[in-house]
């Protein structure tokens, strides 16, 4: 792990099963933890405005991306892998009319993009709960964020399985 990607504990009070989050994701969780519910929603909307544009090669090419059907709004994602570094670049497409979905995607992008496979795979499934959004966002929308994280992890595992025979041979 590089200095700027050191893992930080991201535990909730009384959380005995605290898992370590990558530093950049822990910072986002900490930002949310310091806010009241209404402010958390405002921060989520702020994140939605910060979702990076898709690279040109993916614009108008959603067929090259995976749709996360669990999200209430259309959301597509794709990953690019750097096996030499063991890192993944994550790209999302979500319409501006879906600020909650875009906000979740932007959080995952900021917190996970460019990290090592192992760091991403170690992120706990309860990330949406750690953000403390359960009072501000419906459970269905929170499941969408969990689904995004799940797809990212599944894609990394599939990539590792596909590239393992090539690396062994």
Region locations from a protein language model:
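A general alpha-helix detector
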Residues: 27-28, 103-107
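Amphipathic alpha-helical interface surfaces
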Residues: 40, 73, 100-105, 116, ...
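Globin-like tetrapyrrole-binding proteins
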Residues: 2-10, 15-18, 146, 153, ...
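Structural motif
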Residues: 34-37, 95-100, 140
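Extended low-complexity intrinsically disordered regions
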Residues: 18-65
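Conserved interaction-surface patches within small, structured recognition/assembly domains
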Residues: 80-99, 109-113
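C-terminal binding/interaction regions
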Residues: 96, 118-123, 127-169
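Structured beta-strand/loop patches that form or line metal/cofactor-binding pockets in enzymes
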Residues: 58-81
């Amino acid at each position: 792990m590089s200095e700027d990607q050191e893992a930080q504990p991201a535990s909730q009070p009384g959380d005995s099963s605290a898992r370590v989050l990558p530093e950049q994701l822990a910072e986002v969780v900490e930002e949310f933890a310091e806010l009241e519910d209404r402010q958390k929603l405002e921060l989520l909307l702020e994140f939605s405005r910060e979702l990076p544009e898709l690279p040109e090669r993916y614009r108008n090419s959603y067929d090259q991306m995976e749709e996360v059907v669990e999200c209430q709004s259309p959301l597509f994602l794709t990953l690019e892998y750097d096996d030499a570094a063991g890192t993944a670049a994550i790209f999302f497409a979500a319409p501006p009319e879906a600020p909650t979905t875009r906000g979740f995607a932007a959080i995952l992008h900021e917190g996970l993009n460019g990290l090592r496979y192992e760091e991403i795979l170690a992120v706990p499934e309860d990330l949406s709960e750690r953000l403390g959004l359960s009072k501000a966002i419906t459970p269905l929308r929170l499941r969408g964020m969990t689904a995004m994280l799940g797809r990212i992890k599944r894609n990394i595992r599939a990539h590792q399985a596909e590239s393992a025979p090539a690396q062994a041979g």
